[in-house]
Design a protein with these regions (language model features):
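Radical SAM [4Fe-4S] cluster-binding motif and immediate context
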Residues: 167-328, 332, 341-344
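Flexible glycine/acidic-rich beta-alpha junction loops that bind and position SAM and/or redox cofactors
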Residues: 10-14, 107, 194, 241, ...
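Hydrophobic positions in alpha-helices of CheY-like receiver
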Residues: 35, 84-92, 250, 278, ...
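Acidic, low-complexity intrinsically disordered segments
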Residues: 2-224
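Structural detector of well-ordered beta-strand residues that form the stable sheet scaffold
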Residues: 96-98, 120, 260, 287, ...
């Protein structure tokens, strides 16, 4: 039985970070590696990453003639996946189709379609393997759907084989994150121990948090050829004890890697010693949800941090020469003066990289229902739910002006001459040209929004 695991390209309307980063489809690699031994010789599995694949989707279907196709994606891919499943059914009438990924696990009903046979809303690896076994046993679609719907609740343990990175060997040199290239992914924990009101990640595990055994993580790290490693935990910087074990094992095994991680500002502010030790074993950059400089916003988001904590965090990372990728949420009550104050604050702290996200109450989060009446876009306009489009009506300026202020803030923070020279010195001219080209494409998407006014 021939099986294709497909990551689709984003919609052209989606304001895409794929212009400055393309990461490996780790979830599909896990599916590939965890096919049960008793059926492994009965299935031919290929991962097709259409973000970097040169063939057109229709040509892939004609050449491969799959029996089963499984798609992965975010909310922005829902419409695309529906259309791709319809195309597959028309070209290959016998093919079975499925959809998975983080959005399917939280809002599975979005994938309801006559062209999608199976939706994996929990325990994707087990559900995928169950589907394979039943398809090999000639079960019909309704029988498989019934079996999937009666599957156990979401698991809070992780005992799977390491991802099959060889399944994307033809694409690996194309995977990068900003200046981290080529870059591999690893996940050491699942869920988040905090409960920020805007966060989609915690909904995936229904608010639960669990971590892998650190020895197993280190064994996986040793098998990864890339030097640049992006640890994609929702919050890697959480437990001092666990991080100490990570530091000790990295040192004992003499692992030479460069790490990019997610971390909270309060942990960094309170644990400068641990951050320094992580720097010594390869920590290069941290993505930090600064979220806001306004106290009221931080309380509304249930962030449990303060402006002062954020400032201390930034200063610690700067002192240790650890790159900061700061993310901030821009509320819709922002005024022109608020944009100016935020820009000045970021510039005064010498923040070099920032991701400014208009407040986006994603379907599936606890804040979504509170904002339904204020939506500018349809719930079903999936491609614009990218945390870059303005989906709520700004209170004190036009949509066009809001986009203009966003773009202006980006340029005022990022495109400072002293930052550009420092980045060239640190990463080289070629890497900076690549980033400039990618960021210019994102800027053009914003410019089109400004011209159109929506």
């Amino acid at each position: 039985m021939k099986v294709l695991l497909i990551r689709p390209q984003p919609h052209r309307e989606t304001i895409g970070l794929q212009h400055v980063m393309i990461c490996e489809p780790l979830e599909l690699e896990y599916l590939s590696s965890n096919v049960p031994d008793e059926i492994r010789n009965s299935v031919d599995i290929k991962i097709i990453d259409l973000i970097v694949e040169k063939k057109k989707y229709e040509d892939v279907l004609r050449d491969e003639q799959p029996d089963f196709i499984l798609f992965t994606g975010y909310i922005t891919h829902v419409g695309i996946i529906r259309d791709m499943c319809e195309t597959a059914k028309k070209l290959i009438p016998h093919v079975k189709t499925g959809a998975g990924g983080v959005h399917a696990e939280v809002v599975s009903t979005d994938f309801k379609s006559e062209f999608i046979d199976f939706v994996y809303d929990r325990n994707g690896i087990e559900g995928f393997n169950l589907t394979l076994k039943m398809l090999l046993g000639n079960s019909d679609i309704s029988e498989i759907q019934a079996a999937l719907s009666s599957a156990p609740d979401k698991s809070t343990s992780f005992s799977f084989r390491h991802p099959d990175r060889s399944a994307v060997s033809k694409y690996r040199e194309k995977y990068y994150y900003m200046f981290h290239s080529p870059c591999a992914l690893i996940k050491t924990s699942f869920g988040c121990p905090y409960n920020c009101s805007f966060c989609f990640c915690r909904e995936i595990t229904e608010g639960r948090y669990f971590a892998r055994d650190m020895e197993d993580v280190i064994n996986e790290l040793k098998s990864i050829p890339e030097e640049e490693i992006y640890i994609v935990d929702d919050d890697f910087l959480f437990s001092r004890e666990r991080l100490r074990k990570f530091i000790d094992l990295i040192s004992e095994e003499n692992i030479k890697k460069k790490f990019l991680v997610y971390g909270r500002a309060d942990f960094i502010a309170e644990n400068a010693d641990i951050i320094a030790q992580l720097k010594a074993v390869g920590l290069q950059a941290v993505i930090v949800g600064i979220e806001s400089v306004r106290t009221l916003d931080l309380k509304l988001y249930n962030k449990r941090t303060t402006r002062e904590i954020n400032e201390k965090c930034i200063k610690i990372l700067k002192a240790l020469d650890i790159e900061l990728y700061a993310t901030l949420i821009i509320p819709l009550d922002f005024t022109v003066n608020d944009f100016r104050e935020l820009t000045a604050w970021l510039r005064n702290l010498n923040v070099r990289f920032v991701n400014l996200q208009p407040l986006t109450p994603l379907p599936g989060t606890e804040i979504f229902d509170s904002y339904v009446s204020r939506l500018l876009v349809k719930r079903e306009d999936y491609e614009v739910w990218d945390m870059a489009h303005v989906v709520l009506k700004p209170e004190f300026m036009s949509i066009r002006r809001f986009y203009r202020e966003l773009l202006r803030a980006y340029y005022k923070v990022i495109m400072r001459p002293k930052h550009i020279f420092a980045l060239i010195k640190k990463y080289g001219i070629c890497a900076n040209i690549k980033m400039l080209a990618g960021s210019s494409l994102v800027s053009m998407q914003y410019m089109r929004k400004i011209v159109r006014g929506h």
